[in-house]
Amino acid sequence: MKVLIATDGSKYGKWATEWVARMPFAEKPDVSVLHVTDVEALRAPFMFQPVVIGNEPFIQEEIKRIEARGKTAMAEAKAQMASLKLKGKLVSERGAAGSTILDRAPKRDGLVAIGSRGLDALDRFMLGSVSTQVTLHAPCSVLIVKEEPRPLSRILFAADGSKA
């Protein structure tokens, strides 16, 4: 089974990696950890509004900060995988987070694990929710992680009788 862990370096992304490491797969999964740097989102407001002269240096400074955060997230993901004895590859890409994750998502027999920041309805509307986008459009199962892993005491299995 192919497993894609999408991380942004937050505690939720790290928890997703921990959940995957603890899952009892029948066979050892082919794991990839993906971090997406979305720098185009910085320019998005200026595509529809007149550009204020002098903004570009600030945008470039913010791009450098975001890229540095991405490098830190990848270094932390590498260390976390080693500490969890989870073997796999690390992938860093630039683009829109949701669509890049969907492009990299395993087909049918795979799994995408992604953290959820727990945005309220207004924030989801204003900022967009990557986990919601992935859940709605992924070609495979999606594990949304909202809390750090702990031993499971109860499991609810819901079935509607369909093949899915």
What are these regions (language model features)?
Residues Y12, D38-A41, K64, A68-V112:
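Structural beta-alpha unit
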Residues M1-P57, L84-K89, R104, L152-A164:
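Small/aliphatic-rich secondary-structure junction motif
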Residues F46-V51, G70-M74, L102-R104, S141-L143:
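Short hydrophobic/aromatic-rich motifs at helix boundaries and adjacent loops
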Residues A26-V33, M81, L111, T135, ...:
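Short, structured motif recognition centered on aromatic/hydrophobic residues
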Residues V39-L42, I66-A73, F125-S129, E148-S153:
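Low-complexity, flexible helical/coil segments
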Residues D8, R69, E93, L122-D123, ...:
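Residues that cap or flank secondary-structure elements
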